Amino acid sequence: MISHLSHQNTKASTGHLLALFTILIWGTTFVSTKVLLIEITPVEILFFRFLIGYLVLLLIYPRSLRIASFREEWLFIGAGICGVTLYFLIENVALVYTTASNVGVIVSIAPFFTAVLAHFFLDGEKLTHRFIIGFGIALSGIILIALNGSFILQLNPLGDLLAFIAPAVWAIYSVLMRKIGELRYHTIGATRKVFFYGLIFMLPALFLFEFNWDLGRFTNLANLSNILYLGLGASALCFVTWNRAVNLLGAIKTSVYIYLVPVITVVSSALILQERITWVIILGAFLTLLGSYISERKR
């Protein structure tokens, strides 16, 4: 009994560390993306980062993943479409039609969508009152960070609607990855397969959006280092660690760490881009951390 509890605690601790590590990286991707956007379009960044991620995972785990049934194959297809193609494309298109603040706040409700879907479609994952209270507190903090003292409400129906769809799509991805995790496939191999389908379904978008195959832009050290950071770190490494965390903690507990992304983004922007941190941002960060703590606490 004691040995079983110790094993469970070790699994939980590992899951929390992996989720925190992932979010620390993902929270800084905004800075890299901002640098790349000077010369490279959003869809180009998206394609190249996941292509690099896929090739790295293929190099690390070249073995073919033998899927037991076509039903299981559909789980990988769905995860690739939702977690790689649709989520990032919808988020980028939303930014064209609405403000970055609106998108930042709306996308941060992903843990709530994930909790609702997990409650209905995953065994042993239930939506609790504590989670809802924590969600409300964290969301208020995220709103403060996004607005940063400029309390001007700007509604852009199309862009805001797309921004709402993005976290719903991420929630579907989280649930699908939890189901894939239950099948006991190798985490790196499973993530690589998800990337493969994500890239396949991304191809039509290359014709719909402006896409330039010119690789000469990556001879620029800033462009090269940042696309490698996104491809190696934020994609290849972090999707593996995130998917492993989902397997260990469950979709709901892991998703709570998404609340921390705006906080990490603000801190990294201040350190690297010299952007100013105000008392409103500090209060927002405190509320976000408090909300995530309440959501994670056991009864």
Give the positions of each predicted feature.
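Helix-helix packing/entry segments at the starts of transmembrane helices
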Residues: 46-48, 103-109, 176-200, 231-271
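C-terminal-most transmembrane helix of multi-pass membrane proteins
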Residues: 2-8, 12, 17, 48-51, ...
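Transmembrane alpha-helical segments that form core, pore/gating elements
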Residues: 31, 57, 114-116, 121, ...
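Glycine-/small-residue-enriched transmembrane alpha-helix faces in small-molecule transporters
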Residues: 2-44, 81, 153-179, 201
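Specific transmembrane alpha-helical segments of multi-pass solute transporters/efflux pumps
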Residues: 25, 29-30, 58-107, 117, ...
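C-terminal transmembrane-helix exit sites in multi-pass transporters
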Residues: 56-66, 110-133, 263-282
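Hydrophobic transmembrane alpha-helices of multi-pass small-molecule transport proteins
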Residues: 57, 77, 117, 129-149, ...
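Juxtamembrane helix-entry segments on the extracytoplasmic side of multipass membrane proteins
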Residues: 11-15, 39-43, 47, 68-74, ...
